[in-house]
Structure formats: structure tokens, C-alpha cells
Amino acid sequence: MGTIVLKMTAEQISVLQKDLASYATATKNPYAFFSAKVDGTSVIAYTSGKVTFQGAKPEILASRFGYQAEPKQSPDGQNLALIGSDEVGNGSYFGGLAVVASLVTPADHAFLKSLGVDDSKNLNDSKIRQIAPLLEEKIPHKALLLSPRKYNEVVGDGKAHNAVSVKVALHNQAIFLLLQSGAKPDKIVIDAFISEKNYQKYLKNERNHFEFPITLEEKAEGKYLAVAVSSIIARNLFLKNLDKLSQEVGYTLPSGAGAKSDQVAAKLLQAYGDQALQTTAKYHFANTKKAYQRLK
């Protein structure tokens, strides 16, 4: 929970009141004359002329009314042209595996921040569906989607890949294609899902290679705008694929790998047989066995 306090003129507060009128809430504070709540951020205007913004990300709303964040020291490479790569779908039973690599330069930062691109994990799916097309249009990127059918052909015992090596292959290919398109980064960062040593081990099996060094960094999505952009575009690609598969089978396929996925998988088995899971799900997940057990 963060708090931002602004000293505002009567005119500025009047503008704030008008803008947030539809979000107004009641306040019992004797020193406050206006309060509102917008997307989880509480706003209170005091008779002293001070206005507080309190919530998980108060700076987003406060910036609309004159707040300017103190410059923070950026992570190494943040102020460089940076390729960031991330994947979505690897933890979901249903749906494909989406990997996106994006090139972000310092000139893009203001645009990205105006959209609220920080860490896509703080954005709901509705917001992601709204933002992703804007990012796809403006930010150079390469997006790959491995469908469940293709995933099941290449991932598993005795097949070309395991669940980790297939991600190495997709990240490598997305970055390779972006570099081939003319992207000239100062740094390449992947949201870490494996050690550097093992990444390089799996990389030896790939056909396409590039000389530019990569950095595997944990929680990179929250540190680098390029990785956050890739995460948002990848999430949207994954959701669109999940929608398409749901329409094809006539059942709403959930994201994730919990009990709901077991239930839907059992219904698909009952309605269409094993082939339905081969074309909509990552078959090697434990959910497949649990779905069969539900039919006994």
C-alpha cells in the first residue's frame, strides 16, 4: 500500500472533484470535504488543500493531477534499447504456449507508462486485451504460439523436447526473428525460468543462433518495460487461443491447472474422447490423469 500527498490549489481540487465525481464516496473525516475511490486507489481532499492518494499504485491516478514521480535509479540497461522476452501459458493445462520478444527504446517509455505497462501480473485480462493491440501496433516484436496439438507432438517422453527445453527453443526463435528483422538492442533480457548453464545446454540443440549475449533475470517483468510488453502481448495471444479452442469444442476452457481444469477435461473426454485433450490441452500435465479418474 502506497500513499502520495499533493498540495493543490482550490482550482486544481475543483478539477479533481469534477473528474472523479462519478467515483465519489462518503467520508466521516471532519477535515475532508471530498473522497473517491478509483480502481483500488482512495482519494481524500482536505480543507487544508492537501489531497491524498492511497492504494497499491497511487501514482497512476495521482499523475493525472500533477504528480511527478521522483526519478529512480533504473536497473542496469533500462535506459538502453532493450529486447525483452517472456512466455505465457506454460502453467495452464488448456491452451497453447505463447512466447514474445519485444524491442523497447527509451523513446517508448512515456507511451508505455501512459498505458500503465509496468508488470502485467498487476493487470486483469480485460485490461490486457485492451492494451495489447496498442502495443502490437507500436512496439517492434515477434510473437510465437505453439498450439496444444503441436505442443503434444514435440513435448513428452521420447519426443524432441521437455517442458523446459521447448521454452528455450521458443525464446531463442522469437529473439532470433526480431534480430533478423533489423532490431538493434543494447541488451537482451529473458524473464528467467531456468539457470544460465541449462539454458545454454538446451540452446546447443537449436538450429538458429545469434552472437548477442542474453541475460536471464528473475522477475524481469517488473523491472524492464520490454519484458512487461512481451508478457502483455503473450498473455493476449494465449487468451485469444483459449477463446478459439473454447469455441471449437463448445466448452469454456479455463486458464490454469486446478480442479476446474480437471472438471472440464473430464467433460471433454466424455463428449469427444481422448483426441479432444490432444488438441486443446498440454497432455502430459497431471490433469489428464485426474480427468480420467473422474470418469471411473
Swiss-Prot record:
Single Gene Ontology MF annotation: magnesium ion binding
Recorded catalytic activity of this chain's protein: Endonucleolytic cleavage to 5'-phosphomonoester
Cofactor(s) listed: Mn(2+); Mg(2+)
EC number per UniProt: 3.1.26.4
Entries under Pfam families matching the protein: DUF3378, RNase_HII
Known role: Endonuclease that specifically degrades the RNA of RNA-DNA hybrids.
Protein name, entry field: Ribonuclease HIII
Gene name of the encoded protein: rnhC
